[in-house]
Amino acid sequence: MFIHRMKSNLASLFLSFFLLLACEFTFSYADFSTTTSDATHPSATATEDIFSTPAVPSLGLAQNPSVYEPYRGDKCGGYNAIQVSEYEKGVLAILQLNGDPCYAYGTDYPFLALNVSFDSIDRLHVSIQDLYGAQFQFSKRTDVWDAPLYHFQPQFGDRTYNFSFNSQPFEFWVTRVSDGEVLFDTRGHKLIFEDQYIELTTNMVDDYNVYGLAETVHGLRLGNNLTRTFWANGNPTPLDRNAYGTHPFYLEHRYTPSENLNSDGQPSYTSSTHGVLMLTANGMEVLLRPNYLQYRIIGGIVDLYIYVGGTKNPKDTVSQFVQSVGTPAMQQHWTFGFHICRWGYKNVFDLVEVKENFKNFEIPVDTFWSDIDYMYEYRDFTVESNAFPKDKMMEFFNSLQQSNQHYVPIIDAAIYAANPINRSDDVYYPYYEGVRRDIFLRNPDRSLYVGNVWPGFTTFPDFTNPETTNYWTECLMNLSAAFGYNSSFPLPYSGLWIDMNEPTSFCIGSCGTDKLDQNPVHPAFILEGEPNNMVYMYPEGFEHTNASEHASAYQASVSQYYATATSTVESVKATSTPLNVRPKYNINYPPYALNTEQGEGDLSNLGVSVNATYHDGTVRYNLFNTYGYDQSRVTYDSLTSIEPNVRPFILSRSTFVGSGKYAAHWLGDNYSLWSNMIFSIPGALTFNMVGLPMVGADVCGFMGNTDEELCSRWMALGAFLPFYRNHNSLGSISQEPYRWESVAESSRCAMNIRYSLLPYWYTLMYEASSQGLPLIRPLFFEFPNEPSLANADRQFMVGSALLVTPVLEPNVDYVRGVFPGDNSTIWYDWYDHKVIYRQHNENITLSAPLTHINVAIRGGNIIPMQKPSLTTHETKQNPYDLLVALDSDRKACGSLYVDDGVSIQQESTLFVKFVANGDSLSIESYGDLQVHEPLSKITIIGLPCAPIGVYFEGVQVESFSYLEDTKELVLTNLEAFTSTGAFSNNWTISWNLPV
């Protein structure tokens, strides 16, 4: 903190000095204020320009996205750098507008302040703001968002980058010292800095490989013909459009041909990776084009962070970034089990039945979830007492406690606005207490902002208000009481699912103002499963395997379509923005219209309006993308105040940079389609790049009806993503894995692997939490020098040891995949431990019957395992196994992290290192946690011949076998050597091979 403040104070002194010089040198403050004041201060704008309360709910005003208009920056002259000061820790300068204002999509500032800070040896910060600070500055709102990059500590060593610039016009570029690579380069592009439009452009190398820029539904590699919009959106998983979260960080990976050939005699490459974060909560577009990448921001300032990365592997760049914004929270051990959920578990008896069915079918499950069915009329912090009576809920919670299983309910962001003339609403504490404490979002005239969500007209908590945390904590305790709270259950639920927290609202503006006497009102559309909205959608290929059922569903869907009224809205630009004419400041309809997914492009469609205000008067226009982050933060603080030192488990739909510190994430309301299963892989990989590694998709699909084949394949795939939950929607057919015999078998097989790998998963989570490393990784992360892997996103790595190759299409019993690395890299099949023979870059065909998913082990790894059971708790009590996969040099290594699986602050932990050489396997343990479970079995694959003898700390091991076909040594009955715990002491196992 001290270092950060010292740097800030130094910069302030320089800027104050520059202000004095600039005022004398070029302009007077009076001139500046008359030019821009009404354009930069929303409070100075007429009320009707920023306040919209429609008389009736509507779709808003349709917009034509500005990205499709002819480019307007050609006549902008950019800025010149004056009064430049270079010092040890950065560069300070004033930037002066070069020529007349160009009014691209706003009013140009005549003077800007440049502050380049050499934050660390591998991170550079470039800040550009208007000279007098009229623009909203997100970095000043540490009450809303805080991160380690604001509190950096000094690092010793030489900087790994150089910052260079030209003054007239001002342009800059950043170079990596080690290889001379230019990482960010604005040369040839003019900076545009206006009150509602900022444009910054960097040159890109040919055919660049860029990843990240979440959240959208897209392939892993973004390509060079894409516009990414950052505007939190509650619409279900739109392809190539803005979705729930905002993570304006990208990772770029470059390949450089080498003069040398690899061991296969093929051309070889070196590679490098770097990352860039444009930190803003305002709306933004990023244009990826063949030779450049361009930021277009509709407010705020330029707040750019460049991460130098390096030439070793992309994981280093991810680690640099994640550690700067906050490493992800360590998850509880049970969260890596299987979770079952649906919108449609209509009473507690449904939950009990599902629990019993999993037990009867012997399918592992750890957590049962409730969607909004459990609430009284969909109102937060209530329980429908007829369907979920307290006594039956307590019986259910007791049964979960006895079986060491868990329960997670949903909480939506919106709070039902009580009907003032309905006496039964008088007891709705969350609303009246929120009004009393003044913790809800307001309209600009200070009236309550009232939107429309599931329960009817609703209000929205202001999670930036310090008072909201206490309010939220009390509401969570009230929910415990509503479930039947007693002293044996501090919280009857083990985590919280926070949803609809972009936040979503089903109308434009404060549509419930003066209408609360109509509550509760039905959402402004027909719910799935209601008349005229029955679910007839099935996966691609369903017509080939279920022809008669498909024909019936198709005919019914056609009839329903023609029975439902439809309408269209003409798309016109709501606010005319003529060329080179100063536009009017307007936050509801900014001069630059973002290319959004919502409705017809109105920024407030399907969300709380941009003119809604926070407790301090800040409009949502400037904090639009942080609502889910702040709800996660407040929920985290509330849960830790209720159960101190217990790691909160929070699943959030909307996320922002650094949300991983507080929450996990699922990929949202997907469809039961093969295409959606495919996109779940790049989606999960991308979130692992941006610091939210605990991520997964709704297995088998949320909307529409799944089928047996899709669900079987998806249950297998989901077992290898960090967060593993089956969830589907109201009106869809049931899709628990026991509904079909093949799905049950596929699930058991995949879960058997997942649960046996719990020690491995948990160790990966520890590395993510401590170092910012991803749990799952694209192939190029582990094999960074192979250009053919740049687009690979239908296979992925779990850690560095396992390669997963799922089937992603219907009606096949095979799958094709690559096994990276040169001839020195060995891959073993998970199931039979045989070597997978292939040529470099060869796409080989693998057998994949319906209940099978292909998994390969990378030689050189040691994987800690435990015998799987039906819950994570039972599995954790079982003996350990070690799987040792030797590489071509007959070496391997691995690690294990163990703690109590629950606590934030650990009293004791254990970290174990495993090392295998040609004739021995050794462990070294660090820490004082006593692990009582013994070691049962060690499997060593890749040993060329049978050993003459095997010894545990010099004592001969009698129980071992060697399988010639797989070159596999199996040691069993090791409990006798490790009865006090598998890793309570350091030990070495050695073997003698024949000469």
Curated annotation (Swiss-Prot):
One of its GO terms (biological process) is carbohydrate catabolic process. The active site is at E502, D669 (proton donor). Belongs to the glycosyl hydrolase 31 family. InterPro entries: Gal_mutarotase_sf_dom, Glyco_hydro_31_AS, Glyco_hydro_31_C, Glyco_hydro_31_CS, Glyco_hydro_31_TIM, Glyco_hydro_b, Glycoside_hydrolase_SF. PANTHER family: ALPHA-GLUCOSIDASE, P-TYPE DOMAIN-CONTAINING PROTEIN. Its EC number is 3.2.1.-. It comes from the Eukaryota. Pfam families: Glyco_hydro_31_2nd (PF01055), Glyco_hydro_31_3rd (PF21365). PROSITE patterns: GLYCOSYL_HYDROL_F31_1, GLYCOSYL_HYDROL_F31_2. Its main location: other. Glycans are attached at N115, N162, N225, N422, N478, N486, N546, N611, N670, N823, N843, N986. It is found in: Spore wall. Keywords: Glycoprotein, Glycosidase, Hydrolase, Signal. One of its GO terms (cellular component) is spore wall. Coiled coil: none annotated. One of its GO terms (molecular function) is hydrolase activity, hydrolyzing O-glycosyl compounds. This is Uncharacterized family 31 glucosidase C1039.11c. Residues 1-30 form the signal peptide.
